[in-house]
Curated annotation (Swiss-Prot):
TM stretches of this protein: none
Its EC number(s): 2.7.7.1
Disulfide bonds: none
Family listed: Belongs to the archaeal NMN adenylyltransferase family.
Catalytic activity of the protein: beta-nicotinamide D-ribonucleotide + ATP + H(+) = diphosphate + NAD(+)
Annotated pathway: Cofactor biosynthesis; NAD(+) biosynthesis; NAD(+) from nicotinamide D-ribonucleotide: step 1/1
PANTHER family named in the record: BIFUNCTIONAL NMN ADENYLYLTRANSFERASE_NUDIX HYDROLASE, PHOSPHOPANTETHEINE ADENYLYLTRANSFERASE
Keyword Iron-sulfur: no
Record GO terms (molecular function): ATP binding; nicotinamide-nucleotide adenylyltransferase activity
Protein name per the record: Nicotinamide-nucleotide adenylyltransferase
Annotated GO biological process: NAD biosynthetic process
Length: 171
C-alpha cells in the first residue's frame, strides 16, 4: 500500500520524523508532499522546496523507508486541488493529514483519510522552532542532525533574522 503525507516541513523536525517512521510501519511506500512548495523567504515559510527536500532526503537516508518526496503547489481553487496532487504523484489510496481542509477535500474524493498522531507537539512545532532560531535560543536538539547541517549550509538562521528586520522605525 502507498500513502500520501503532506506538510510544509518548515523546518523538518523530529516530530515529523517520528510520524513518518510510524506511517512506514503501516504502508509499503510513503509519498511525502512538500506542501506550499512555491513559498519561501518569509518568516512562516523561510525555506525553499529544494531546501526542504534536502532536509527530508538527507534525514531519511539513515532509515529503511521507501518514499518519494514531491513538491506540491498551493492553488487557489480547492475543488480541483486533489486532482492536481493526483497528477503529480504516484497513485495512492490513503492520505495522512492533520489539516481539516485537506481531510475534507480527500474525503470527498473517497480516499482513506487518517489523522496522524502528533508526536510531542509541545516541543516539536515548526513555529516554535523558527521562533527559537530568530531569538537565538537552542533549537538544534529539536531537528535531526542532517537538518541542522542543511540550515547551516544555506545560512538559514541569518535568512530568518534578515526576514524579520523592519524597513522602518516603529513608534
Amino acid at each position: 500500500m502507498r500513502a500520501f503525507l503532506i506538510g510544509r516541513w518548515q523546518p523538518f523536525h523530529k516530530g515529523h520524523l517520528e510520524i513518518i517512521k510510524k506511517i512506514s510501519k503501516e504502508v509499503d511506500e510513503i509519498i511525502i508532499g512538500i506542501g506550499s512548495c512555491q513559498k519561501s523567504h518569509t518568516l512562516t515559510d523561510p525555506f525553499t522546496a529544494g531546501e526542504r527536500m534536502m532536509m527530508i532526503t538527507k534525514t531519511l537516508e539513515n532509515y529503511d523507508i521507501n518514499y518519494y518526496a514531491i513538491p506540491i503547489n498551493d492553488i487557489d481553487y480547492n475543488a480541483v486541488w486533489v486532482s492536481c496532487v493526483e497528477s503529480l504523484t504516484p497513485p495512492f489510496t490513503t492520505i495522512y493529514t492533520g489539516n481539516s481542509l485537506v481531510r475534507e477535500l480527500f474525503s470527498e474524493k473517497n480516499y482513506n483519510v487518517k489523522k496522524p498522531e502528533l508526536y510531542n507537539r509541545t516541543d516539536y512545532s515548526g513555529t516554535k522552532i523558527r521562533k527559537k532560531m530568530l531569538d537565538g535560543s537552542n533549537w538544534e536538539h529539536l531537528v535531526p542532525e542532517e537538518v541542522v547541517k542543511v540550515i547551516e549550509e544555506i545560512d538559514g538562521i541569518n535568512r530568518i533574522r534578515r526576514l524579520s528586520e523592519k524597513d522602518y522605525d516603529e513608534e
